[in-house]
Amino acid sequence: MSNTISEKIVLMRKSEYLSRQQLADLTGVPYGTLSYYESGRSTPPTDVMMNILQTPQFTKYTLWFMTNQIAPEFGQIAPALAHFGQNETTSPHSGQKTG
């Protein structure tokens, strides 16, 4: 199942542990505008999405964002939260210790 553009923006932001304000500051997209994009009230134009995806933290999600495909061998991955469903905000393993 494919996520909407707004869901993908939220997944990328949360996977990078960024607040909406931090993403706005990082990309230059005004906070209110970003809020509209994330809520699905408005769709970001291509130039805005290009700007977001060219930000160093997000280039690794470009293939996934555009095609729903990944290529880990080329550094193209999906956000971690995408693997657990669009309504989840934590991994089922988030409470476990590693090592």
Swiss-Prot record:
InterPro entries: Cro/C1-type_HTH, Lambda_DNA-bd_dom_sf. It comes from the Viruses. The gene is C. Residues 9-63 form the HTH cro/C1-type domain. This is Repressor protein C. SUPFAM superfamilies: lambda repressor-like DNA-binding domains. Keywords: DNA-binding, Repressor, Transcription, Transcription regulation. Residues 20-39 bind DNA. Signal peptide: none annotated. GO terms for molecular function: DNA binding.
